[in-house]
Each structure stands twice: as C-alpha cells, then as structure tokens.
Amino acid sequence: MNDFLITKVLNNNVIICTKAQAEYVLIAKGIGFNKKSGMILQENQTIEKIYILDQKSQQDHYKTLMELANDTLIQAVIEAVNIITNSEMKVDNQKLVISLTDHIIFAYKRLKQNQLINNPFIVETKQLYSKEYKIAEKVIERLNHVLEVHFPEDEIGFIALHIASNTESLSMREMDLINELINKSVFILENDLKQTIDKDTIQYQRFIRHIQFLIKRLRNGESLKKTNAFEALLKEQYPLCFNIALKIMRLLQQELKIKVYEAEVIYLTLHVYHFMENHKS
C-alpha cells in the first residue's frame, strides 16, 4: 500500500490515488482523515477494509455519487458494505460498493423527502433469499443507527436483492423479472383455483423455489426427463391442475422468449395439485 500517492481527498472516507501512473479510488472508513494531496498512504496505517476501484467507468460513477452525499452518509454506506463482505457471502467487492452506494444514497434522500417506494416482492425475496435477507436486516439496522432514521421493511428486501444479484451473477433487472413472473404465476394459481394462497406456508416456499429454479434451467437450456405415461395420467386425473400448470408455462415461455419443455408441466402440475388439496383440507 505504501506506493499509493494521494492526489485528491474527496472526503474522510474516499481518496483518489495514483500508482505506477494509473489512477485508483480507495474507499474505507476514515481513510481520508487528516490526509492531503501529495501524501503517501502508509502500509502500516490501521484501516479496517479498503475497496479499490481501478476501472475508469466505476471511478467516474462513484465520484459523481460523492457529490450527492456527505461524510456521514458515505461512512454509513461503507459500514453497510463491510457487513456484507464480512459475511459468508462471496461477492464482487467493486460491483457491490458501487451498486449499494448508489442505492443507499437515493433511498436515504427519498426517505428524508417522505417518498417511500413499496416493495411488491418482499415476501418472495424473504423466502427465496433468506440468508441475504438476514444480512440485509443487519445492514438496515446499522444504517438506521448511524443515520438516525428508520428505513421501512421494504428497504430490507431491496438490499437483500442487491446482495443476491451480486452473489448469483444476475442483474437487478433479471431478479425483478423473476419476482414478477412468480407473482404472475401466483395470480394464475389463485384465479383459476379460486383460492387465496397463504404465503407463509412451506408449500408456497416450495412453489416459488420451483419457479425460480425452473427459470434458471430454461435460461441455461437445461431440460428434465419427460415421462409420457405420467403426463397422460396427470392430464386425465387432474385436468384443472394440468391446465393451470400449462398456462403458467406459456406465460414463462412468452415472457422469457425461451422454449419450455413439456416435462416441466408434469412437475409444476404436482405443485398446483398440492395447493388444491391443502385448500380442501
């Protein structure tokens, strides 16, 4: 670290340095305190964790974000990132520090202006990404403490999705699409079965996980082994369940623009059947 030359101190937590004629943005709690341009960053300086941005596009975006936030907010964001990177989750530190800084700065500004955004996927996020959700709870707890605010539970879900999108190599847009397709599938279920699905049940957790992994299989071009005899049996004995499963499959095929293999209908029919039977009992 001792060969980093400080060229600019953005704030107490962010500095711009050069090393071997290349520019870097260094981010860490208190890294800029009492620092000035022209100083060398000492290797033995006690710093909890440093995040280094070496790509110009990332640096430019991060510098722009720094103009929108004060030291306290940036420190809170860094502490939030530290909570995630110190957890068992394997994340891309550079990608995470950029996306989370962007999200938290604007979430904080919306909160101060009382412009809250409802999270329609809070239940699904909590079910699908339980580990990420628990970490997000700690993040929000820390943000609330440092910033002296109270983020709503919806924000826990948003943070959890940021963590999950980083660990699963999916963009936020792709994760939103998966949640949207799950919601549309549940709507088809409730509408055709004429019942309200209890989202706190194990059956619901299994269903949304099935849809989640089904979408992943489709995107990866994977298919399940087809059993014609079993398919014919389900179609004959449980026509309503089979048709609901078929309708959901057509939805996925249309939205994802990917071929859905017939074998998938069999396994989805079984899930629909369990919902129908549990409702009867």
UniProtKB/Swiss-Prot annotation:
GO molecular function: RNA binding
Sequence intervals crossing the membrane: none
PRD domain boundaries: 65-173, 174-281
Repeat recorded as keyword: yes
One Pfam family of this chain: PRD
Keywords: Repeat
GO BP term (any one): positive regulation of DNA-templated transcription
InterPro entries associated with the record: BglG_antiterminators, CAT_RNA-bd_dom, CAT_RNA-bd_dom_sf, PRD, PRD_sf, Transcrpt_antitermin_CS
Gene3D superfamilies assigned: 1.20.58.1950, 1.20.890.100, CAT RNA-binding domain, PRD domain
Superkingdom of origin: Bacteria
SMART domains from the UniProt entry: CAT_RBD
Keyword Endoplasmic reticulum assigned: no
Protein family per UniProt: Belongs to the transcriptional antiterminator BglG family. GlcT subfamily.
PANTHER family in the record: CRYPTIC BETA-GLUCOSIDE BGL OPERON ANTITERMINATOR, PROTEIN GLCT
Protein name: Protein GlcT
Organism, scientific name: Staphylococcus saprophyticus subsp. saprophyticus (strain ATCC 15305 / DSM 20229 / NCIMB 8711 / NCTC 7292 / S-41)
Gene that this sequence comes from: glcT
